[in-house]
């Protein structure tokens, strides 16, 4: 029975495999090594945090919902009871000592689950929450680091986009430095030219002054040389006479 199920499943999956070899009885030849191929780009559906509802700790709720329209509310229980009695009556399942051991172990497991399942579940949930908190902290830290890296990258991109302003500033600074150097040299040349012109003016003034003094001395010398002794005596006598006349006039004037 089980071999037939395996063969039917293999035959169903065979058309889906590319370049699949001939399938032998119960043998499924894989065309590639699992867990080493290219991962699919389709997003995986999120796994549920909690499992679905079950009855009797084993049978899913969907099984009962599937049988309710066909068998009614008591149908699944009647079906289970009938199958159990059928297996026992036909000796498909034979009761052995292991059966009672299994019932005892299952009962013990059920008792432990009913007694301590809630506390164990809370403990496991607490461990899970702590692990989730740690993972969330790591996630937030990673997101913060990534966001900081993104902000730094944006800042660098903004600086790169504004680099022409930096070039303009450097160009203006160079032009300003050249202008300052030009004006300093121009002022230095102006001072040198002014000093030289002042020097030439001073030389010309000194030459004129020396020439005037020399001319005055030369004229005075020749005038003195041209005056004879008789003319000097006559001039002195005339000056003395003039002084006497001025003294008489001063004495003759009444005092106010």
Curated annotation (Swiss-Prot):
Cellular component GO terms held in the UniProt record: mitochondrial inner membrane; proton-transporting ATP synthase complex
UniProt GO BP: cellular response to hypoxia; proton motive force-driven ATP synthesis; proton motive force-driven mitochondrial ATP synthesis
InterPro entries xrefs: ATP_synth_Bsub_B/MI25 (IPR008688), ATP_synth_F0_suB (IPR013837)
Organelle targeting peptide span: 1-42
One example GO MF annotation: proton transmembrane transporter activity
Keyword Iron belongs to the record: no
Modification sites for N6-acetyllysine: 139, 154, 162, 221, 233, 244
SUPFAM superfamilies the record matches: ATP synthase B chain-like
Record Gene3D superfamilies: 1.20.5.2210
Pfam family, one: Mt_ATP-synt_B
Keywords: Acetylation, CF(0), Hydrogen ion transport, Ion transport, Membrane, Mitochondrion, Mitochondrion inner membrane, Transit peptide, Transport
Main location as per UniProt: mitochondrion
Membrane as UniProt keyword: yes
Subcellular location: Mitochondrion; Mitochondrion inner membrane
Tree of life domain: Eukaryota
Function (record text): Subunit b, of the mitochondrial membrane ATP synthase complex (F(1)F(0) ATP synthase or Complex V) that produces ATP from ADP in the presence of a proton gradient across the membrane which is generated by electron transport complexes of the respiratory chain. ATP synthase complex consist of a soluble F(1) head domain - the catalytic core - and a membrane F(1) domain - the membrane proton channel. These two domains are linked by a central stalk rotating inside the F(1) region and a stationary peripheral stalk.
Record text on subunit structure and interactions: Component of the ATP synthase complex composed at least of ATP5F1A/subunit alpha, ATP5F1B/subunit beta, ATP5MC1/subunit c (homooctomer), MT-ATP6/subunit a, MT-ATP8/subunit 8, ATP5ME/subunit e, ATP5MF/subunit f, ATP5MG/subunit g, ATP5MK/subunit k, ATP5MJ/subunit j, ATP5F1C/subunit gamma, ATP5F1D/subunit delta, ATP5F1E/subunit epsilon, ATP5PF/subunit F6, ATP5PB/subunit b, ATP5PD/subunit d, ATP5PO/subunit OSCP.
Protein family: Belongs to the eukaryotic ATPase B chain family.
Name of the protein in its database record: ATP synthase peripheral stalk subunit b, mitochondrial
Organism annotation: Rattus norvegicus (Rat)
Gene: Atp5pb
């Amino acid at each position: 029975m089980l071999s037939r199920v395996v063969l039917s499943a293999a035959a169903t999956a065979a058309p889906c495999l590319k370049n699949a070899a001939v399938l032998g009885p119960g043998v499924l030849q894989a065309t590639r090594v699992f867990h080493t191929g290219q991962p699919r780009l389709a997003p995986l559906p999120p796994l549920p945090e909690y499992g679905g509802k079950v009855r009797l700790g084993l049978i899913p709720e969907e099984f009962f919902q599937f049988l309710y329209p066909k068998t009614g509310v008591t149908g699944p229980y009647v079906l289970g009871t009938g199958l159990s009695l059928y297996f026992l009556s036909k000796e498909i399942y034979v009761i052995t000592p292991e059966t009672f051991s299994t019932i005892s172990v299952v009962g013990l497991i059920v008792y432990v689950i009913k007694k301590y399942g809630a506390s164990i579940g809370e403990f496991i949930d607490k461990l899970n929450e702590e692990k989730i908190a740690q993972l969330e902290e790591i996630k937030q830290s990673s997101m913060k680091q990534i966001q900081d890296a993104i902000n730094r990258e944006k800042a660098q991109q903004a600086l790169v986009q504004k680099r022409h302003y930096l070039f303009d500033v450097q160009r203006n600074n160079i032009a300003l430095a050249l202008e300052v150097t030009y004006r300093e040299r121009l002022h230095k040349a102006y001072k040198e030219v002014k000093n030289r012109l002042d020097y030439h003016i001073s030389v010309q003034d000194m030459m004129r002054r020396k020439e005037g003094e020399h001319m005055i001395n030369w004229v005075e010398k020749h005038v003195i040389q041209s005056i004879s002794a008789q003319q000097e005596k006559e001039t002195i006598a005339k000056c003395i006479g003039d002084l006497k006349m001025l003294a008489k006039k001063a004495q003759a004037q009444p005092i106010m």
